[in-house]
Amino acid sequence: MAYPFQLGLQDATSPIMEELTNFHDHTLMIVFLISSLVLYIISLMLTTKLTHTSTMDAQEVETIWTILPAVILILIALPSLRILYMMDEINNPALTVKTMGHQWYWSYEYTDYEDLCFDSYMIPTNDLKPGELRLLEVDNRVVLPMELPIRMLISSEDVLHSWAVPSLGLKTDAIPGRLNQATVTSNRPGLFYGQCSEICGSNHSFMPIVLEMVPLKHFENWSASMI
């Protein structure tokens, strides 16, 4: 999860987030090289006589500054499209969970089980226990099995919301009357926090999301106790 004065991204918990982190580093390297080259040329122009005021035509230069940006854009677009298709692909999900956004809480329904559904509200600051996180803890966590593909169906009962868990690389809009899909896969157990990421009213900041990823055996015990 995030911590104060953090400079980088949160630790990746899913294969998708690992790919997004690698793509971020890849793109940042390209931006850094371009920025360094531009600053170097500007510094040469200011400190030397590297100017050609009499040049009227330079076909070679124009060819280079046309082809080179196109190649750079291709180097950015190809991995981006690959990740985009990976995020939309899901085969044989082990579990399907329907998520509904409300003003201002989330409700969850495990569609593979009968009567396994609940609302998830933020715990007020005055009710927090020692060690719990302010504005991030909820009364009912979403318990899911780790290392299995899980399909999240996301929608809204009222206004636009957005279901986002950064460490899993997830951010999916919850739109009234529309059902969006996301894939959740966790490589390790633990608690993973997120929040509504679409301004949805006065209590928008009080819609946390908590996923508790556990081994399959623990999930089966939990689901049996909830039914």
UniProtKB/Swiss-Prot annotation:
To which protein family does this belong? Belongs to the cytochrome c oxidase subunit 2 family.
Q: Which gene encodes it?
A: MT-CO2
The residues the record assigns to binding Cu cation A1 are H161, C196, C200, M207
**Cofactor(s), names only, from the UniProt record:** Cu cation
Q: Which GO terms describe its biological process?
A: ATP synthesis coupled electron transport
Which residue intervals are topologically Mitochondrial intermembrane?
A: 1-14, 88-227
Catalytic reactions on record: 4 Fe(II)-[cytochrome c] + O2 + 8 H(+)(in) = 4 Fe(III)-[cytochrome c] + 2 H2O + 4 H(+)(out)
Instruction: Keywords in alphabetical order, please.
Output: Copper, Electron transport, Magnesium, Membrane, Metal-binding, Mitochondrion, Mitochondrion inner membrane, Respiratory chain, Translocase, Transmembrane, Transmembrane helix, Transport
Q: Name any GO cellular component annotation.
A: mitochondrial inner membrane
Mitochondrial matrix topological intervals: 46-59
Function description: Component of the cytochrome c oxidase, the last enzyme in the mitochondrial electron transport chain which drives oxidative phosphorylation. The respiratory chain contains 3 multisubunit complexes succinate dehydrogenase (complex II, CII), ubiquinol-cytochrome c oxidoreductase (cytochrome b-c1 complex, complex III, CIII) and cytochrome c oxidase (complex IV, CIV), that cooperate to transfer electrons derived from NADH and succinate to molecular oxygen, creating an electrochemical gradient over the inner membrane that drives transmembrane transport and the ATP synthase.
Cofactor notes: Binds a dinuclear copper A center per subunit.
Q: What is this protein called?
A: Cytochrome c oxidase subunit 2
